Design a protein with these regions (language model features):
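Solvent-exposed, positively charged interaction surfaces of folded domains
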Residues: 78
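Low-complexity or membrane-interfacial segments used for flexible interactions
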Residues: 2-65, 71-74, 87, 98-202
Length: 202
């Protein structure tokens, strides 16, 4: 498990997913597209500004799990609903594991009763579920904004939604420097998967 510093600027370390591989000293622009088909477990593809594939997201057959893979198909993260907890909660594990020892972070709705669907991200190092969140996601009509901590003072990533032909959405993601962009992509995928049932399921 990665070690996390005490200051807000060190809460999103290079080692959250893979040692420094997905963290760079400059802002990163990515595009996430839905690639899901009726008989396919392919859900999303993430490309960089050169059009090269950076990540893929697949659904595990006969399971509620989703896998974030690198361009070579290596599993990086497993995203899974949290059983017997309030609806909308997701837990994210290292690789293909779902062991508590490999838990990296959880995503949950900020409050049970709120006008906007905002979400909290809590790192696995926070054992108290009532503790303040490590990151907050503010959801707009066509954008997500991700902040460090409880306040909205320090943005680490943003997503803007563009609608293309055949009603498919293209999500344009900007990740600030020194922020793990595999981590950011996993958060956006989780919100996209929660979205269809957000009003009725939470």
């Amino acid at each position: 498990m990665a070690e996390y510093g005490q200051t807000a600027r060190h809460v999103a370390p290079a080692e959250l997913v893979a040692t420094g591989k997905f963290t760079v000293p400059y802002a990163v622009n990515l595009t996430l597209s839905n690639t899901g088909g009726l008989f396919s477990n392919d859900l999303y593809k993430v490309k960089d500004t050169n059009g090269d594939v950076v990540f893929k997201v697949k659904a595990a057959f006969f399971s509620s799990r989703h896998l974030l893979l690198d361009a070579k198909g290596t599993p990086l993260l497993t995203m899974k609903p949290k059983v017997r907890r309030r609806r909308g909660t997701r837990r994210v594990f290292r690789g293909e594991s779902t062991s508590p020892n490999d838990l990296l972070f959880s995503v949950r709705k900020s409050k049970m009763f709120q006008r906007k669907d905002n979400f909290d991200v809590v790192l696995a190092t926070s054992t108290d579920e009532a503790a303040p969140c490590d990151f907050k996601i503010i959801v707009g009509s066509k954008e997500y904004t991700i902040y460090i901590g409880e306040t909205d003072h320090e943005i680490i990533a943003q997503m803007n939604r563009k609608t293309e032909c055949c009603a498919r959405d293209r999500l344009e993601i900007t990740v600030n420097q020194n922020v793990d962009f595999a981590f950011i992509v996993s958060l956006i995928v989780i919100l996209e998967e929660i979205k269809p049932s957000r009003r009725s399921a939470m």
